[in-house]
């Protein structure tokens, strides 16, 4: 355990006692160092190690502690003022820094300090919360929200109104993860630490949490909390055991490999689904 991690872990155990007035200098410095590291991409709340996603709980704890050490303050915006504990990521950005970091931010897009945005990303009017990681070449479309500590892969499209759940409210054990080269359709929600593996296509209006049945119609298998790589998913329902009613589920209607995904348009994949 590093010294930085040890400080965070110790502070978290006595978090109820920590306020902006009582926090000691060492703890404040450690928390701020973590937030800066998350902001720059040096740290990630979750990362793939040996093919498996690993959550660094101490980094998540630092994010939670950051709310304990700061008072609300006035934050100036173009159209109005805000009053919050967390600064905005781009508050001190210059044109040179935007150019150097290489992403686009459309007016009214909001990103909190402590979120990382990779090169070639485009942020339409959307919201990215503290601790989140947005991978290279990803589009966060209009009114999409990326929750606290959520991990978004490379070349992902989060369509209009998509919601990717965070870990802070309500408190979750692990962040929601969207793998590389995924398409999440308009108004879909992926929450509660669900993992969408690489190369998935989620149709519009699909809602997936930890308790959602993810039914593979080819194999009959039911998954929870994980969408297997290369899945094309639509909303559906499954009959109850008594046969008197049906309950919502997500349905894997087909699997595609990276080569097919690269050659075939998203709309074609979704429109070619047989009933």
From Swiss-Prot:
It comes from the Bacteria. GO terms for molecular function: 2,3,4,5-tetrahydropyridine-2,6-dicarboxylate N-succinyltransferase activity; nucleotidyltransferase activity. It is found in: Cytoplasm. InterPro entries: DapD_Trfase_Hexpep_rpt_fam, Hexapep, Hexapep_transf_CS, THP_succinylTrfase_dom1, THP_succinylTrfase_N_sf, Trimer_LpxA-like_sf. It catalyses: (S)-2,3,4,5-tetrahydrodipicolinate + succinyl-CoA + H2O = (S)-2-succinylamino-6-oxoheptanedioate + CoA. Keywords: Acyltransferase, Amino-acid biosynthesis, Cytoplasm, Diaminopimelate biosynthesis, Lysine biosynthesis, Repeat, Transferase. GO terms for biological process: diaminopimelate biosynthetic process; lysine biosynthetic process; lysine biosynthetic process via diaminopimelate. Its main location: cytoplasm. It is an enzyme of class 2 (transferase). The keyword Acyltransferase applies. Substrate binds at residues 104, 141. Pathway: Amino-acid biosynthesis; L-lysine biosynthesis via DAP pathway; LL-2,6-diaminopimelate from (S)-tetrahydrodipicolinate (succinylase route): step 1/3. SUPFAM superfamilies: Trimeric LpxA-like enzymes. It holds the Pfam family Hexapep_2. GO terms for cellular component: cytoplasm. Homotrimer. Belongs to the transferase hexapeptide repeat family. PANTHER family: 2,3,4,5-TETRAHYDROPYRIDINE-2,6-DICARBOXYLATE N-SUCCINYLTRANSFERASE (PTHR19136:SF52), MOLYBDENUM COFACTOR GUANYLYLTRANSFERASE (PTHR19136). This is 2,3,4,5-tetrahydropyridine-2,6-dicarboxylate N-succinyltransferase. It comes from Haemophilus influenzae (strain ATCC 51907 / DSM 11121 / KW20 / Rd). The gene is dapD.
């Amino acid at each position: 355990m590093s010294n930085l991690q040890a400080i965070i872990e110790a502070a978290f155990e006595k978090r109820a006692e920590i306020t902006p007035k009582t926090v000691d200098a060492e703890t404040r410095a450690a928390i701020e160092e973590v937030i800066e590291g998350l902001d720059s991409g040096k740290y990630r709340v979750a990362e793939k190690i040996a093919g498996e996603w690993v959550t660094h709980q101490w980094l998540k704890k630092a994010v939670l502690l950051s709310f304990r050490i700061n008072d609300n303050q006035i934050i100036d915006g173009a159209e109005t003022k805000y009053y919050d504990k967390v600064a905005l990521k781009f508050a001190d950005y210059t044109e040179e820094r935007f150019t150097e970091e290489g992403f686009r931010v459309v007016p009214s897009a909001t990103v909190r300090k402590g979120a990382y945005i990779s090169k070639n990303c485009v942020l339409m009017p959307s919201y990215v919360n503290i601790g989140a990681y947005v991978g290279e070449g990803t589009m966060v479309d209009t009114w999409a929200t990326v929750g606290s500590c959520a991990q978004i892969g490379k070349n992902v499209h989060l369509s209009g109104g998509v919601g990717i759940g965070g870990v802070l409210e309500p408190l979750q054990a692990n962040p929601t993860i969207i793998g590389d080269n995924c398409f999440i359709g308009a108004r879909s929600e992926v929450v509660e630490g669900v993992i969408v593996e690489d190369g998935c296509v989620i149709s519009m209006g699909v809602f997936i949490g930890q308790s959602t049945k993810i039914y593979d119609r080819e194999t009959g298998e039911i998954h929870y909390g994980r969408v297997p790589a290369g899945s094309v998913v639509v909303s559906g329902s499954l009959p109850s055991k008594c046969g008197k009613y049906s309950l919502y589920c997500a349905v894997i209607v087909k699997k595609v490999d990276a080569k097919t995904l690269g050659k075939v348009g998203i709309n074609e994949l979704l429109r070619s689904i047989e009933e």
